[in-house]
Amino acid sequence: MNWGEQVASRRQRVHEQRPLVHHITNLVVTNLTANVTLAIGASPVMAYAREEVADMARLAQAVVLNMGTLTGDVVEAMLLAGKAANNAGIPVVFDPVGAGATPFRTRTAQKIIKELHIDILRGNASEIASIGGFGGHTKGVDAAGAPARVAEMVKQVARDLNTVVAVTGATDYISDGERLIAVDNGHPLLTFVTGTGCSATSIIAAFRAVEEDGVTASTAALAYYGLAAERAAAVSQGPASFQVALLDTLYNLAGEELARGVKIRLL
């Protein structure tokens, strides 16, 4: 089965199995990520009360931890949900929003990674570089040669943390420390709508719920999402119409059209 067929197959699995994805996410993106999760055929739940997060995590097929709007209570809730998911064998996808921006965010990201088993770590290059101890090595990621450095960094962080790392940007890179894959689908309009990175994390979690291999799940999810962004941008006039078109395209994109449009490279 080639990559196009694998992407279409995993997208179909999500549609058929409708996995429940428990989100502890940030206040800015809750509505968009819930709607994206619904549009792809999965079921979102957005529960963050400490009194119920462990119970909710055990009901889910995947758990998303997103530290975008961080408080002490949110950190505690994420740890409770993550430990419950770990004990039940439910995959945890962690989005370390803003890691490296403040000491609190950096410490929190490190604490979550230390105390939980993270199946997939999804972030941008600077967030993952901060977590991996690469400091400012991703400064100027659009400069000549920078994509190669980002790819190497992704593979090294995945190896060091013994997890799957997915870095999203103009090109997405996915690695488990051994395999390294690039996804070239996407569109610049994604950067003009708040929550599109967080939505990528939600889609990865839904795909991981129906696919045991984290590299395959992340690659398929990001190729599908990136192609949907390309199709949505083609019928949009700007960020507002793009957001609506993106939800519609995620809902409709499947099968042969999806398989033919993905741009995936093995590195």
From Swiss-Prot:
Pfam families the UniProt entry points to: HK
EC class (word): transferase
Catalytic reaction annotation: 5-(2-hydroxyethyl)-4-methylthiazole + ATP = 4-methyl-5-(2-phosphooxyethyl)-thiazole + ADP + H(+)
Entry-linked Gene3D superfamilies: 3.40.1190.20
Biological process terms in GO annotation: thiamine biosynthetic process; thiamine diphosphate biosynthetic process
Its job: Catalyzes the phosphorylation of the hydroxyl group of 4-methyl-5-beta-hydroxyethylthiazole (THZ).
Protein name: Hydroxyethylthiazole kinase
Record lineage: Bacteria, Bacillati, Bacillota, Clostridia, Moorellales
Gene giving rise to this polypeptide: thiM
